[in-house]
């Protein structure tokens, strides 16, 4: 996977809307779009995972997200792809009825693939995986939507509540690929998780109907706008500076 254009914030969307970036230069070739939803419990590191993948940077403190949709141009096996990554608000552990979570449902229906994230330091977030997996499958009854399970915070061994083999066993049982990562310390593992999904979706789209292949094309983004992400970085850095000053 090769980056061919900088990450672009598409939108912080109102409920029910997904808008796209416009193209960075008129007349450029179209790119096939790949849509990935990142879901999981609160505080497991979904936003950090997305930002790490898109920018290779890690900042530990983020404001609670309202559901940001990001785009990045990449090249896989010589094909230009526009990856759209939907960062979703955390699912509450006590949310017994996922059907009523409108924002989650819209994100899952929109997606071509799903990343389910849990934290090895939070066994309750691990308990959500099966429910989220089943829910995603129910929303795509006629399509074998690719799903990757990511165990985050692998560096926090002293706080570990979930053993790696438990995550791997569950992923195997559900028929999913499994990655244990430390978003804060290892970019490569994060990259690999998304690369696997991109290749699998691209393969599915290549074997789809002509109409499906036609619908998967969108214009390349133009006028990249990173203001939203830069604002988050500045807020996080400012908070750290204030904390250090007050000590």
Swiss-Prot record:
Q: Which NCBIfam families match?
A: small_GTP
**Disordered as annotated region, ranges:** 205-228
Query: What GO molecular-function term can you cite, just one?
Result: G protein activity
EC number(s) reported in the record: 3.6.5.2
Q: Where does GTP bind?
A: 40-47, 87-91, 152-155
Q: Gene3D superfamilies in the record, alphabetically? A: P-loop containing nucleotide triphosphate hydrolases
Name the catalysed reactions: GTP + H2O = GDP + phosphate + H(+)
Query: Which CDD domains would you find in this protein's record?
Result: RERG_RasL11_like
Q: What SMART domains does the entry give?
A: RAB, RAS, RHO
Protein name per its UniProtKB record: Ras-like protein family member 11B
What biological process terms from GO does the record include? mesendoderm development
The family note in this entry says: Belongs to the small GTPase superfamily. Ras family.
The highest taxon in the source lineage is Eukaryota
> Which residues, if any, are the signal sequence?
none
Region of interest: Small GTPase-like? 29-247
Q: Which InterPro entries match?
A: P-loop_NTPase (IPR027417), Ras-related_GTPase (IPR051065), Small_GTP-bd (IPR005225), Small_GTPase (IPR001806)
- The transmembrane residues are none
| Name of the gene | rasl11b
Q: Which UniProt keywords apply?
A: GTP-binding, Hydrolase, Nucleotide-binding
Q: EC top class, in one word?
A: hydrolase
């Amino acid at each position: 996977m090769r980056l061919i254009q900088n990450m672009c914030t598409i939108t912080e969307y109102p409920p029910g809307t997904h808008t796209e970036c416009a193209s960075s230069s008129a007349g450029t070739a179209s790119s096939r779009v790949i849509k990935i939803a990142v879901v999981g419990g609160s505080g497991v590191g979904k936003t950090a995972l997305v930002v790490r993948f898109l920018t290779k940077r890690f900042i530990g403190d983020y404001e609670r997200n309202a559901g940001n949709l990001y785009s990045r141009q990449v090249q896989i096996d010589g094909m230009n792809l526009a990856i759209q990554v939907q960062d979703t608000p955390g699912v509450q552990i006590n949310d017994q009825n996922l059907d009523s979570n409108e924002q989650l449902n819209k994100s899952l229906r929109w997606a071509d693939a799903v990343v389910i994230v849990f934290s090895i330091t939070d066994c309750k977030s691990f308990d959500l995986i099966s429910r989220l997996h089943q829910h995603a499958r129910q929303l795509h009854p006629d399509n074998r939507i690719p799903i990757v399970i990511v165990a985050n915070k692998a560096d926090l061994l002293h706080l570990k509540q979930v053993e790696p083999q438990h995550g791997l066993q569950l992923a195997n049982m559900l028929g999913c690929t499994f990655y244990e990562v430390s978003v804060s310390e290892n970019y490569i593992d994060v990259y690999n998780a998304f690369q696997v999904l991109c290749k699998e979706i691209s393969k599915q789209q290549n074997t789809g109907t002509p109409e499906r292949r036609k619908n998967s094309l969108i214009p390349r983004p133009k006028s990249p706008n990173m203001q939203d992400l830069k604002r988050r970085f500045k807020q996080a850095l400012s908070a750290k500076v204030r904390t250090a000053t007050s000590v």
